[in-house]
């Protein structure tokens, strides 16, 4: 990399080129854009060399299809990966500019929602750092999911215009645009003894790629994230309608095409919403596969070699249409037989399942699929027919198993079944999750094809969530064990040598305090709530959902509130409870949960006695950058989902990496955290997955009985409807008592409160900091470097 003066000269040239005026006259946003453009150009040079080297070595490429890529801000991340963050800060200081202020100009790209998208981004980071050829295939959403606002305690949604000021990291590639076809009908004819299928009277949408460089640590390799934007093939204007004043009809064709990539996850509670969702999924698949095929064709190899040169990975079921679409291309466009096309498809495609909740497994109405994708539906029908015929009818129970695993059933196309049948690998994302898939959710498939199933426990980028997010802790670690952990995170275990070193534990406490001071200053500035830096910082940040049980956390806070109202001198540690996360636009229960948490916050924060001991903060519009502010400061990581419902979770890993101690159920990755840190360095409570499954399938759970037998809980529940919160929450009470508490909030309340009391009382002690250090030391296994290494070896067969 260049020396500072050379770097400064190049930066000022970038200012002149991008802003056409002197540095002193540029706004801070313009200065940021010029710096980002300069770093992107640096990435482009590395990318060209990476492509040349890989082509010479005939390397296999992973195409990672995902509806979400939550990549977060890139400038600081790339300065760190290039090893020039400090030099850049000095260079800017020489020019009278502050790097930290400049970094705040960058907005989080609205390319995802939660763990699914952040996992994909972490994997891209690790694949580039490990020099594994990969192209991420996603959509370039105009307005993302939404920008969350909390107004009078209620979530409201606004469009997230994340690239209103431009996005300097992307590069449009119109020369590689492709056309995607929807609707129409299929005509069949025979030519030279072969059946030809031709789609007629279809609508065409243009897919234009925007490439974002994905830089690996040390700048040894750059991969590509290709985001597709939808639009009309030609801009169309109905002049008659326009001149008649019907402007919406005049632009309808343009608007319909652009709507496909307008928003992430449009509401699918209406037929038009379902249609748009399915259009999104096929648009991604069609555009991505066309791009992949363009690259493969350049090798000159025959199609039989595709599985040797390409791995297509589908991140959840959203890209499941890769199966029939690849079949269509191989048969209809390349002339392969069904048998050859099927063999190639199955050996090329693999699938990650991300849910244990059957209702969350995607299904699409047969009629919708038939209308929107007529040829693909024909292929799906044939896949279904051949699958059904493969069953041995002499085996007892064959019919029930056939019905459970069929692609088409109950008037729907089952995308998870399509993904399992049409690929060579199905993986869960935590050991417990994979066992649940084998034993319940996908048990019939496991009985038929056990060799397809494997576990790949999730991982997160320690370079993003430790090295970048927590520079104080990173320096603390490097001072003791060197910097080898940055590229070999398993070396974090060397920290265990300091677990009984009093001075090191005290230094670790100072690092945590500095992180708390930073977070509390941010909360005071942006949310107007003054929090204590000396007390416990207890955090639950994740998507708002009934099974994630934000209600349970809020009930605990109310129990502590009641305790302090009875006795202001009660032994309740000074605490700040932090919540963040979005509720899906149409998910009423989740929105009501946010309103409830905000009402609890108002009650606690406005009470002159209780607020001296506790504060509650709901931080609106949670995203990657906000998470990076929060993770370093947390003492207690709330991972309290109903056991058996969380596939894995990655927030738990980010908190662990930053020294928080997990308070959680035996669910998802919590199980593996416990196995690595030891039961004494994590706080586990509540029902197990076996117990929740038994209650669900056999009955015997009585929520009302739980409420009536526990006076503390009964008093907490009274807050729901006694107007002490300034409002009544009848729907929440009904969910718990009338509908028997589907997620066992009331059953787990008492052990949860007891576990919190014990853990919170220990924070601040050397024994707690010892637990914290052990968690950091054992977090290396949860790096995405380890996870992608397993995918590379076991699923994609690259090395």
Where are the predicted features?
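A conserved ligand/cofactor-binding region detector
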Residues: 1-799
């Amino acid at each position: 990399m260049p020396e500072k003066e050379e770097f400064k000269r190049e930066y000022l040239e970038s200012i002149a080129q991008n802003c056409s005026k002197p540095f002193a006259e540029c706004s801070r946003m313009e200065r940021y854009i010029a710096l980002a453009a300069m770093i992107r150009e640096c990435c482009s040079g590395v990318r060209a060399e990476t492509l040349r080297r890989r082509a010479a070595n005939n390397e296999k490429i992973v195409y990672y299809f995902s509806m979400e890529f939550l990549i977060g801000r890139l400038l600081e991340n790339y300065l760190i990966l290039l090893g020039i963050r400090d030099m850049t800060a000095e260079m800017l200081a020489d020019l009278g500019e502050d790097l930290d202020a400049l970094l705040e100009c960058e907005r989080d790209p609205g390319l995802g929602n939660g763990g699914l998208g952040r996992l994909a981004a972490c994997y891209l980071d690790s694949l580039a750092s490990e020099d594994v050829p990969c192209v991420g295939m996603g959509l370039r959403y105009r307005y993302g999911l939404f920008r969350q606002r909390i107004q009078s305690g209620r979530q409201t949604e606004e469009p997230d215009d994340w690239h209103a000021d431009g996005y300097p990291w992307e590069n449009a590639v119109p020369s590689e645009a492709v056309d995607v076809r929807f609707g129409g009908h299929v005509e069949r004819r025979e030519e030279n003894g072969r059946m030809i299928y031709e789609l007629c009277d279809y609508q065409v949408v243009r897919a234009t790629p925007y490439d974002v460089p994905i830089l690996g640590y040390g700048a040894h390799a750059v991969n590509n994230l290709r985001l597709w934007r939808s639009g009309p093939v030609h801009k169309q204007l109905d002049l008659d309608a326009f001149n008649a004043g019907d402007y919406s009809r005049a632009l309808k064709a343009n608007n319909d095409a652009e709507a496909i990539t307008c928003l992430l996850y449009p509401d699918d509670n209406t037929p038009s919403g379902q249609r748009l969702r399915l259009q999104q999924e096929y648009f991604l698949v069609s555009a991505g596969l066309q791009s992949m095929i363009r690259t493969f064709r350049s090798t000159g190899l025959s199609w039989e070699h595709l599985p040797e040169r390409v791995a297509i990975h589908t991140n959840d079921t959203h890209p499941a249409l890769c199966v029939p679409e690849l079949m269509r291309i191989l048969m209809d466009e390349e002339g392969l037989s069904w048998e050859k096309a099927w063999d190639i498809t199955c050996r090329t495609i693999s699938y990650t399942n991300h849910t244990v909740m059957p209702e969350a497994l995607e299904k699409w109405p047969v009629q919708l699929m038939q209308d929107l994708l007529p040829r693909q539906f024909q292929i799906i029908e044939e896949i279904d027919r051949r699958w059904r015929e493969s069953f041995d009818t002499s085996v007892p129970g064959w019919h029930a198993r056939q019905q459970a695993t069929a692609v088409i059933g109950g008037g729907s196309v089952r995308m998870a079944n399509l993904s399992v049948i049409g690929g060579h690998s199905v993986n869960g994302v935590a050991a417990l999750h994979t066992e649940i898939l084998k034993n319940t959710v996908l048990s019939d498939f496991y009985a038929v094809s056990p060799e397809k199933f494997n576990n790949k426990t999730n991982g997160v980028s320690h370079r993003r969530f430790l090295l970048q997010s927590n520079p104080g802790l990173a320096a603390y670690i490097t001072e003791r064990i060197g910097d080898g952990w940055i590229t070999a995170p398993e070396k974090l275990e060397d920290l265990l040598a300091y677990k009984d070193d009093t001075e090191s534990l005290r230094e670790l406490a100072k690092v945590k305090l500095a992180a708390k001071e930073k977070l509390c200053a941010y909360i005071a500035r942006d949310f107007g709530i003054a929090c204590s830096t000396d007390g416990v910082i207890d955090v639950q940040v994740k998507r708002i959902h009934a099974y994630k049980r934000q209600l349970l956390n809020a009930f605990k806070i109310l129990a502590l509130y009641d305790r302090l109202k009875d006795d202001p001198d009660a032994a309740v540690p000074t605490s700040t409870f932090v919540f963040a996360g979005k509720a899906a636009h149409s998910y009423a229960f989740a929105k009501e949960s946010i309103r409830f948490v905000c009402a609890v916050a108002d009650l606690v924060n406005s009470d002159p006695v209780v607020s001296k001991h506790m504060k509650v903060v709901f931080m609106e519009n949670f995203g990657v950058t906000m998470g990076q502010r929060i993770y370093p400061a947390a003492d207690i990581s709330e991972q309290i989902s109903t056991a058996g419902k969380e596939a894995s979770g990655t927030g738990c890993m980010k908190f662990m990496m930053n020294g928080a101690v997990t308070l959680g159920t035996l669910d998802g990755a919590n199980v593996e955290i416990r196995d690595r840190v030891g039961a004494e360095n994590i706080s586990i409570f509540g029902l197990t997955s076996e117990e929740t499954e038994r209650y669900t399938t056999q009955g015997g759970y009585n929520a009302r009985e739980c409420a009536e037998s526990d006076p503390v809980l009964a008093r907490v529940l009274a807050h729901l409807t006694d107007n002490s919160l300034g409002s009544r929450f009848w729907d929440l009470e009904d969910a718990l008592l009338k509908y028997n508490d589907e997620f066992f909030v009331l059953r787990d309340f008492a052990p949860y409160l007891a576990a919190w009391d014990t853990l919170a009382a220990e924070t601040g002690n050397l024994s707690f900091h010892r637990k914290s250090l052990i968690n950091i030391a054992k977090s290396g296994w949860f790096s995405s470097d380890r996870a992608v290494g397993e995918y590379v070896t076991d699923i994609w067969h690259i090395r």
